[in-house]
Amino acid sequence: MKVEKGKAMNRLVRSALLGVLTLAVLSCEARTDRTDTGGVLLSVSDFDELPIAFSVSSNCEFTSLCFVQVGSLTVRNVILNPNAPNSDLMDVEIKSYQVTYRRLDTGTRVPRPLVEGQFGIVPHGGNMQVDNLVVMGPEQLLNTPLSDLLLVNGGFDKETGSPVIKLELALTFFGKTLSGDDVATEPAKFAISFSS
């Protein structure tokens, strides 16, 4: 009799757990089916004065203050559902940006990523123009592999033997909507050839 009572209790507990689990799954599904009524997307566009070549020796040989800059670019705040109500809480406050590097030649060494603070507000449905954005500084240009291209260091990449290093730069902006949601652009990519 005790065994049957234990089995009945186990069935009751299992049934109750199954009911709670079913309710939880159905609740989650209902939540994920809702439409986003106020999301935004950041994008980078309209590059002007984008450098395609840079001489490390000419610009960095006699100074530690050398930079590669993009003349100007635009960060856009796109409303994902323009038919839904929107507000100033969808404005994005830009906090920082990051540039990462990837070799486009046979080499494997790359500069350290550049991470810098950046301030500005991109209004919902609007743009923010950024002028003279630094995409490489002394930390990238005066260390390997780009420092190999300085004439004082031989003027060629020690890894490949080439006088040119071709890099892809990937630029990402990070920010928050005024309502507190984290937002980032997809990486905007472009290439630069570095020589001695």
Predicted features and spans:
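Sec-dependent bacterial lipoprotein signal peptides
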Residues: M1-L26
